[in-house]
Amino acid sequence: MITMIRRFIRLDAAAGMMLMMATVLAIALANWSVTAAGYQQFLMIPVEMRFGALEINKNLLLWINDALMAIFFLLIGLEVKRELVEGTLASRQQAMLPLAAAVGGMVFPALLFLLFNANDDVTRAGWAIPAATDIAFAIGVLTLLGKRVPAGLKVFLLALAIIDDLGAILIIALFYTQQVFWPALAGAVLAIAVLAYMNKLQVGKTSAYLLVGGVLWVCILKCGVHATLAGVIVGFFIPLRTSDGEPSPATSLEHGLQTWVAFLIVPLFAFANAGIVLQGIVLEKLFSPLSLGIAAGLLLGKPLGITLFSWLTIRLGYARLPVGVHFNQIVAVSVLCGIGFTMSIFITLLAFSGGDAELITYAKLGILLASGLAALLGYLALRGVLPALDKAV
């Protein structure tokens, strides 16, 4: 288990660097006169998929957001299942602290966002934007402090971020679903029933789950629910153990996907969605309720919610601090959780999918600026509270 955590942290640290480079490249290409048109044209390339009478025709940007991100969510589903069954969330005592912290870290940012946007029917739809944490960026910053970071603090951040991702998935399913097409939903329910039956029989063929998962993805896409949720559902049904003692299908797939997700899918998502055209940006609009609500949620709501809910959970005796971790380190890492980026941008695209492109631009700017500031402040806070290297646990 410790080996898996270390591998995960190394991957996410490198992925954080890749994300940063992809973001900078996207902004540069979108704003350089020589490449700006080509960048937009590249994302608008039509890609068509046909299977008999079934036809799915989308541009490259939507394929990245709907199809490739489903693989990202498949990995999240596998990680959440592993942690729930045999990892840091497997027992009540282990799970309570990161669970409470994650809930506080979602509720407070949403409330702060609504304080700024409660009276605007359009921007109010973005209430969940600051509720997410980008695990790759957060872990990337944490690893800059090397061996000074206690193992318990790393596990706490990983568990918190995984629960946070699960919360974001539930929010997407419950609040960002368009009008439902019932025949396609019936097909999705049937596909889920097949997955459940395969899991009950402990079918060990990963390819069988992925094949049914492909059908589920198409059904969910057609029924109006966001198609990326298919990835999470498939991840939950792939078994961790098989009756014949073969290697775990879920663990094998998780290891196989981690590198592709970390170094291709998530950076490609950032490259496709972070290319904000800065020409015409009005400074005053950076201080609009939308941008301020996002910034307040990420920079204030995240640390306040995580810190308060963690303190209450420990105070009431429902949880204990991890071994070698002090509460001021929990406070410092809560600032780091204000890095929203990938999931925040993803929710932005859902919240304003039928609205003004200008709203999306200023929401993305708010996310990028607040996430960058959270990374800097979180690093400085951790640097101040972590023990010197010769005293590190």
Swiss-Prot record:
Q: Which GO terms describe its biological process?
A: regulation of pH
Q: Which InterPro entries match?
A: Na/H_antiporter_dom_sf, NhaA
Compartment(s) where it occurs, according to its Swiss-Prot or TrEMBL record:
Cell inner membrane
Among Pfam families, the record links this protein to: Na_H_antiport_1
Membrane-spanning segments: 14-34, 60-80, 96-116, 125-145, 155-175, 179-199, 218-238, 263-283, 292-312, 330-350, 362-382
To which protein family does this belong?
A: Belongs to the NhaA Na(+)/H(+) (TC 2.A.33) antiporter family.
As for what it does, the entry says: Na(+)/H(+) antiporter that extrudes sodium in exchange for external protons.
What protein is this chain from?
Na(+)/H(+) antiporter NhaA
